UniProtKB/Swiss-Prot annotation:
Record family assignment: Belongs to the FAD-dependent oxidoreductase family.
Protein name: Probable ferredoxin reductase CtmF
Lineage start: Bacteria, Pseudomonadati, Pseudomonadota, Betaproteobacteria, Burkholderiales
Induction: By the monoterpene alpha-phellandrene, but not by acetate.
Gene that encodes the chain: ctmF
Database matches in SUPFAM superfamilies: FAD/NAD(P)-binding domain, FAD/NAD-linked reductases, dimerisation (C-terminal) domain
Listed pathway(s): Terpene metabolism; monoterpene degradation
GO CC aspect terms: cytoplasm
Signal peptide: none
Length: 409
């Protein structure tokens, strides 16, 4: 790309802001327009359910870069900008105010949004979702000493919010329709461990139950009515039942994006002038025989931002990175690396009953993924095993006399 060309980035989250910075780092001298639909400059979302909600961080500390950096690097950051349409033939985007902006390359980094559920009472005051700073501010004002909060959904966000609520002196009850928390995203040992850790700190759990409706009085939530007619009283409720990718813009323009915009190893879509990065994508996984997968994590957003910038600038493709994810709950640090595609063996190292432990997901002796709790060495070693496609025996992994770092070489 040359100095006469323009890159438009739709979405000013972690992925969008990072690709803008990467382009400047690679000496792209053309126009960069970063369009964000929030009134805030790009910020970190993961702390919203943890440190920010708990009052340990403020909005300023969440910013990815100081506001003045965008101007100094010649990045035009446009806030509160909604992109209404994409014209691939004309190579321009149309904003909600009818403004049309042309591009030479377009990056779609529209992220994801909370999944909607149709429940009577869902629009009552005191029923929250958690996706933006404004969402977190609204929830923060509703929790505190003596307040009881119901979490509809037992995924990572639900557990993180429950931990923050208890940390602020409130009480929390997690309502999950599956028979365990983190079903589908964590192993049974990790799921059971985190549930016990929460219960030890006073969090209640109702699993294997359905929510019939949200009840209220004078327009404000008062409880969650279950399918078996039990009532779970609460002062506030948080609906956290997963996310869906914001593919509407791409799909309307004819790109493949049923469950995520399909991209290649360079984060390029079927249109050679359009890239997509972050939560909105479905991408090949080079460490897993290019299996297509929808990854929704900050490390994935950063990796794809680097891929897209390199491709636009004609630079070599960055080396594949091991996908990973983290969660903080109370004083526990959960770290996960890899994806357990087709894993048929789970090997525990350490004892969950004693505290720190790790769980290795394997197939035919190959380490595909690792889950750890307060086990940074095992996490780091596990990442290397995944990267190197290490083949190990169960005996090697479970033997505490064998240094885990020695297994990663």
């Amino acid at each position: 790309m040359n100095a006469n060309e323009r890159v438009i980035i739709v979405g000013a989250g972690h992925a969008g802001a990072t690709v803008a910075m990467q382009l400047r780092k690679m000496d792209f001298a053309g126009d960069i327009i970063l369009l964000g639909d929030e009134r805030f400059s790009p910020y970190q979302r993961p702390p919203l359910s943890k440190a920010y909600l708990a009052g340990e961080e403020d909005a300023e500390s969440l910013k990815l870069w100081p506001d003045e950096i965008y101007e100094s690097k010649g990045i035009m950051l446009v806030q509160s900008a909604t992109v209404a349409a994409l014209d691939r033939a004309g190579k321009y985007v149309r904003l909600a105010d009818k403004t049309e902006v042309s591009y030479d390359c377009l990056v779609i980094a529209t992220g994801s949004r909370p999944r909607e559920i149709a429940l009577p009472g869902i629009h009552l005051a005191g029923v929250h979702r958690l996706h933006t700073i404004e969402d977190a501010d609204g929830l923060k004002a509703a929790i505190g000493p003596g307040k009881r909060v119901a979490l509809v959904g037992g995924g990572y966000i639900g557990l993180e919010v429950a931990a923050s609520v208890v940390g602020l002196g409130g009480s929390a009850v997690v309502i999950e329709q599956q028979d365990r928390v983190l079903a589908g995203v964590a192993s049974v040992p990790l799921s059971d461990y985190l549930r016990r850790a929460h219960e030890d700190r006073g969090v209640e759990f109702l699993t294997g139950v359905q929510v019939a409706r949200i009840e209220g009085s004078k327009g404000r939530v008062t409880g969650i009515r279950l399918g078996d007619d039990r009532l779970v009283p609460c002062d506030a409720a948080v609906v956290c039942v997963g996310v869906v990718p914001n593919t509407g813009l791409a799909v309307a323009a004819g790109l493949d994006g049923a469950n995520g915009i399909v991209v290649d190893h360079d984060a390029r879509t079927a249109d050679p002038a359009i890239f997509a990065i972050g939560d909105v994508t479905c991408r090949p996984m080079p460490l897993y025989d290019d299996r297509m997968f929808c990854l929704r994590s900050v490390p994935n957003a950063l990796e794809q931002a680097k891929q897209a910038a390199a491709a636009m600038m004609g630079k070599p493709r960055p080396k594949p990175e091991v996908p990973w994810f983290w969660s903080h709950q109370f004083d526990l640090k959960v770290q996960i690396a890899g994806v357990p595609f087709d894993a048929d063996d789970l090997v525990l190292r350490g004892d969950p009953a004693a505290g720190a432990f790790s769980a290795f997901h394997m197939k035919d002796g190959r380490v595909l993924a690792v889950e750890t709790v307060d086990a940074p060495l095992e996490f780091a070693a596990g990442k290397q095993m995944i990267l190197r496609k290490s083949v190990l025996s169960r005996e090697q992994l479970v033997d505490p006399r064998v240094e885990v770092t020695a297994l990663a070489v």
